[in-house]
Amino acid sequence: FLGGLMKAFPAIICAVTKKC
């Protein structure tokens, strides 16, 4: 679970803050 979360986190931040 944690591995998947760490994988998805950057994409979520990118989508929310528009900062990649």
Curated annotation (Swiss-Prot):
Q: Which cysteines are joined by disulfide bonds?
A: C14-C20
* Summary of the tissues where the protein is detected: Expressed by the skin glands.
Q: Which UniProt keywords apply?
A: Amphibian defense peptide, Antibiotic, Antimicrobial, Disulfide bond, Fungicide, Secreted
An example GO CC term for this entry is:
extracellular region
Subcellular location(s) per record = Secreted
| Biological process according to GO | defense response to bacterium; defense response to fungus; killing of cells of another organism
User: Which InterPro entries does this UniProt record tie to the protein?
Assistant: Antimicrobial_frog_1
Pfam families referenced in this protein's UniProt entry, alphabetically: Antimicrobial_1
Q: Which family does it belong to?
A: Belongs to the frog skin active peptide (FSAP) family. Brevinin subfamily.
Q: What functional role does this protein have?
A: Antibacterial activity against Gram-positive bacterium S.aureus and Gram-negative bacterium E.coli. Has activity against C.albicans.
Protein name stated in the entry: Ranalexin-1Cb
